[in-house]
Each structure stands twice: as C-alpha cells, then as structure tokens.
Amino acid sequence: MRLGMFMMPVHPPDRMFWSTLAEDSEKSVLADQLGFDELWLGEHFSATTEPIPSPMMFFAGILPRTRNIAFGTAVINLPNHHPAIVAAEAAQFDHMSKGRFMLGVGPGGLVSDFELFNNPDVQARNRMVVEAVDFIQRIWAQDPPYDLQGEFWQVRLKDGIIPALGVGFMPKPYQTPGPPISISLASPNSSSARTAALKGWGMISANIIPTYSVASHWEVYCKACGEAGISPNGENWRVARNVLVAPSDSEAHDRVFGEQGSNRYFYTYMREVLSRVGLLAILKPRPDMPDEQTTVDAITRECVTYGSPKTVLDKLIAFRERVGPFGTLLMTGLDWGGPNAAWERESMHLLAREVMPRFRQHVLAHAAE
C-alpha cells in the first residue's frame, strides 16, 4: 500500500498565480520529506480556479528540491495535444527525473477546455486517448521513418532524416519501454476501466466521486480482465480521496465542515461547476439522490475521509473492503488559505506517520490470509 498526493489543484480564482504555484511547490516538497511515494498533478488550460496548464513544467521546477517522490500527470488530456509533442516532452522529463515519472492520461474533464480545443464529443475524446497512447508508444519503441495514420492524427517523418546527425530522431524515455501509463476514471462504470484492463494501463479513480462509483471501477476492470483471460491486479490502481486527519474526531469535523475549511470551498466549487454543465450526477452519494438533496454537506460526508488517526484508519480499511484492493491511496491537496496550511500540514504528518504504517500492516496481513 503506497501513499501519494494528488492536486487538481483547486484555488480561489482571485489568488495570485505565483502565490498558488509557490504554495503547491511547498506542499509537494513536504510530501517528499514525509515519505509520500508519488505526486500527481492535474492539467487545465482555461480555469484560474484550476490553474496548472503544464504539470510537467511544474514538476521540473520542484525536481531539484525533492529526493525520492515519483511524479505523475493526472492527467495529460490527450485530445488537447498532438501525440508527438507528448511523446517528446514525456521522454525528456523521464530523463530529467531519471525514471521518477508516470504518464497519466485522460479525455479531459473541464468543459471550457472542451470548447477551447473544439473537442465536444465525449466518445470521440475517448477514442482520441487510445489512438494518442498508441502513437506515443510507437514513437518510443522505434526510430524513423514514421508513417502513423489514425482517425484523428498523423505522424509522418520520412524525408527529413539525417541519421549521422541525429536529425529526425525522437527522444526515447529513460525507462524501458517507457513511463508506466494510467488513465483517469470519474464516472460510474467508466468504460476507461475496461480500456485499462485491455491495454495493461493503471487506473486513477477521482477524488470527487462517491464510494459506489469507485467500487464500480474495480467491477468493470475485473469483468474486462475475465473476458480477456487476464488476472486482475489492484497493485496499479490508485484511488484519490480527500483526507483530513486531526488529533481528535471533533477537531477533524470542525475543520472539514467549517466555513473556513478548504474542503468546504472545494466541494462548493465542484458542486456549482458540475451543476452548471449538467454533471451533478458524478457527485451524488446515491445514483437516485434528488438534486436538491445533493448538498455540499451531503457530498462532503460521502467523499471526505476525516477524523483522528484511529478513525481515519478504520474508515480507510472499511473503504478498501467496500471498493476493492487498490494499491495506492492518493491524498488530495487543497488550498492553504487561512488556517488550512497548518491543518493540512498536520494532516499530512499524521497520515504519513501514524495512519499509513497501520494501514499497510492491515493490507499485508489481509493479503497473507
């Protein structure tokens, strides 16, 4: 059982960009110091609330300040990029980090980005992900000439090749055959879980979704594995959750549900933005819950794991028994405005030092039974 940090990130839109970048960098370095195994970062081009357009550029900025933590994109929204650019940039950062890199991919989740890049069709975006990964892996696996023809892109490089000078040759990753690939999952019974099973990719279940939706990802994955004659393995399944650990249950409750708390801001924002685009169902604790009952408090109660170290441990054990054998827990990093910086630092310490060792012991003991 590994521990990682996931950041969309979400910040109030009136905060200065340089300030949130510095804050998220500080949080990332702290995660490395506390022994977090992984750091995953989102990509959004057209929202000052979710202000990171280049996770690999962010990682490059903090790379010299870290020692062990691995870096993952969560995710590169492939419909917004030519696959040759992603292949080259991923190969470069894989070398910069000497293999501490994981390529998370997805079809995108921000409606303004869909409009910006003229990709409104969700089914087309899903096909674009599969085609782009195929092209990326083929670029990594072979030297030119290239003549890759797809539904959405072409990669052609035949004439401008000078082998003795290295001209025409794409960079290859540090890892062989390349960085491990994972795909994001945010809807119940996501078809991307089936894609992950058939392609051998990892899965990243989103932090904003309820328990039943996370469980459905494992069910879809296992069904696809069975159809393909593959043994399902949760080792490469990552589940992101909002986690807040405090010295006592009452303190944790106040920090989660209080008006100053970043979880309150986070779910207020998510509820509003998803409601406006007709996607509130993603957040509903039950599929049949009426919209008017899908309040910020109801979503928070369902999606935030909070309490004392013992309470959070018990909740994580129960959660994993309910959803399936995920191999990595990703704690969601939130905004540090007001008292939240001190609260989240304390939560990170308690999760890493008190909760996770016991959670790992439980998982190992359960696996040995």
Regions picked out by a protein language model, each given a short descriptive name:
Residues 3-7, 39-41, 71-74, 101-105, ...:
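Hydrophobic faces of well-ordered beta-strands that scaffold small-molecule active sites
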Residues 32, 59-68, 90, 94-101, ...:
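Acidic (Asp/Glu)-rich catalytic clusters
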Residues 1-16, 109-110, 162-178, 282-301, ...:
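N-terminal small/glycine-rich loop or linker at the start of catalytic domains
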Residues 82-199, 215-219, 227-228:
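Internal, glycine-rich beta/alpha segment that forms the wall or movable "lid"
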